[in-house]
Amino acid sequence: MQSTKKAIEITESSLAAATTGYDAVDDLLHYHERGNGIQINGKDSFSNEQAGLFITRENQTWNGYKVFGQPVKLTFSFPDYKFSSTNVAGDTGLSKFSAEQQQQAKLSLQSWADVANITFTEVAAGQKANITFGNYSQDRPGHYDYGTQAYAFLPNTIWQGQDLGGQTWYNVNQSNVKHPATEDYGRQTFTHEIGHALGLSHPGDYNAGEGNPTYNDVTYAEDTRQFSLMSYWSETNTGGDNGGHYAAAPLLDDIAAIQHLYGANPSTRTGDTVYGFNSNTGRDFLSTTSNSQKVIFAAWDAGGNDTFDFSGYTANQRINLNEKSFSDVGGLKGNVSIAAGVTIENAIGGSGNDVIVGNAANNVLKGGAGNDVLFGGGGADELWGGAGKDIFVFSAASDSAPGASDWIRDFQKGIDKIDLSFFNKEANSSDFIHFVDHFSGTAGEALLSYNASSNVTDLSVNIGGHQAPDFLVKIVGQVDVATDFIV
C-alpha cells in the first residue's frame, strides 16, 4: 500500500512490490503506512494506537469503568445448563461445550493472556465465573437457528437488573463452532467473543443482525481482519490476503486495545524464540511445518534474541522486522505483523525471491535460495544472501558505521550486488558515490580493500566529507567495482 499524505485507493498496482534493490526496500518500509492524516479508500486512517483506543471506546474493564492498564485475575467455566432452557437473549437448546470446544476455547483464552496482563483460572461448572461459555441451537423453542454465529457481553453489562458481563454464547448449528479444531473460523469466533467479554468492541459501530452493514460503513480504513479479529470485514479491503484462512489470536490492533485495558504481559516469550518453521513458541498459530500450512499472526514478544523462520515457504516473501509493520509470508499478503514495542532480531527467508528488511537491532538476515534483497538498517548486522543473485542494500552511513559494521557473509563475485544508489539519490547526483584508490576527504569517495589471507573485502565510504570514512561494510569474498555495485 503506497502511502502519501493524501487520499489513496487500494488497488493491485499500488500493492505491487518493487523488484530490485533500494526501491524494493523502500516499498516494504512504507507498506501499510497509516495515520498522520492519510486517507485510504475514502476513509480516515487510524494509527495502531488510535485504533486500539477506538476498539476500547466503551471504557469497560473487569477492574472497573475507565480503570486502565491494571492486571486482572479472571475465572471461566463451561456450565452444563441442565436447569436452564433459555438464556438471557431468548435463545434455547442450550448445551455444554464439548471437549473439543473446551480445548479450543482454552487456547483462545491463552492467546489473550499471552499479550495482556490477564490470568485465567477455570472453575467448576456450577461455580460463579467471570467468563462463561455455552451453546445454543434455537432462537425460540422448536425453531432452529442457522443464521447467527455467536455473541457476548462486555464487562459490567447490566440488563433488567442482571449482570450479563462475560457471558459468551455460540450457535452449535454452525459446523465451525461445533468443530473449531478443524475449521479455523470457529477458533477465530471463540477469540473474537472472548475479546468482547474482556471489554473490546468491534472497530466500528455495527453488530450482526442490526441492518446490513458493509465495509463502506466503517469509521476508519483499517477496520478489517488484517488489523483486528474484532472486525467483520475482509482483509482484502486493505490489501491483505489471508487465502481464505482466519487468525486464531489477537492481531495488531487487538493487542494495542487489550494492553490499553490491562497492560502488557512482560513475561511472554522472554527467551530466544523462533516463529514459523522450527518454532519453539508452543502456540499452534505461531508455528508451521509445511509450505501448505499458512500462518496469520501478530507477534508479541517480551525479550530474547528472536527469529522469524519462514525458510520452508516457496513463494516470494517480503519480511519486515520493524515494530507495527506487516510482512507477506508464505504466499499470503499482510498476514504477519509485529506489535508495538516488540523487537524481532533475525529473519530467514525461503526459496523464493524474498525482500528482507531489518531494524535498529543487530540483525541476522538470511535470504535462502532465490534472488533476494537484504537491508539490515541500523545496528551491526550479518547478511547472508544464500544461493541466487542477491542484492545488499544500504541507505545511510549509520546502516554500517565503523566499529559497528555489517558483515556480508557469502558474497558471490559477479553474481551478487551491493546497492548504494540511495546515496546518489539523496545527493541528487548520479556520481556522488565514486571509487578511488585513496581517500582525500571528499564526500562520496569509496574504496575497496581486499585481504587475501582472510578473504575479506572492506568497503569504506566517506559519506559526510570527513577525513576518515564514516561507512564500512565487511564482505567475505572478493568484490568487483565494475560488476558488483548499483550506484
UniProtKB/Swiss-Prot annotation:
Binds 7 Ca(2+) ions per subunit. It is an enzyme of class 3 (hydrolase). Ca(2+) 7 binds at G386, G388, D390, D416. Ca(2+) 2 binds at G304, D306, T343, E345. GO terms for molecular function: calcium ion binding; metalloendopeptidase activity; toxin activity; zinc ion binding. Hemolysin-type calcium-binding repeats lie at residues 348-365, 366-383. The keyword Calcium applies. Ca(2+) 4 binds at N359, A361, N363, G376, G378, D381. InterPro entries: Hemolysin-typ_Ca-bd_CS, Hemolysn_Ca-bd, MetalloPept_cat_dom_sf, Pept_M10_metallopeptidase, Pept_M10B, Peptidase_M10B_C, Peptidase_Metallo, Serralysin-like. Its cofactor is Ca(2+); Zn(2+). It is found in: Secreted. The active site is at E193. Zn(2+) binds at H192, H196, H202, Y232. Has insecticidal activity against the locust M.palpalis. When administered orally to locusts at a low dose it causes them to lie on their sides exhibiting sporadic limb movements and muscular twitching, followed by full recovery. When administered at higher doses the same symptoms are observed, followed by death. PANTHER family: MATRIX METALLOPROTEINASE (PTHR10201), MATRIX METALLOPROTEINASE-21 (PTHR10201:SF323). Belongs to the peptidase M10B family. This is Serralysin. It comes from Serratia marcescens. The lineage of its organism: Bacteria, Pseudomonadati, Pseudomonadota, Gammaproteobacteria, Enterobacterales.
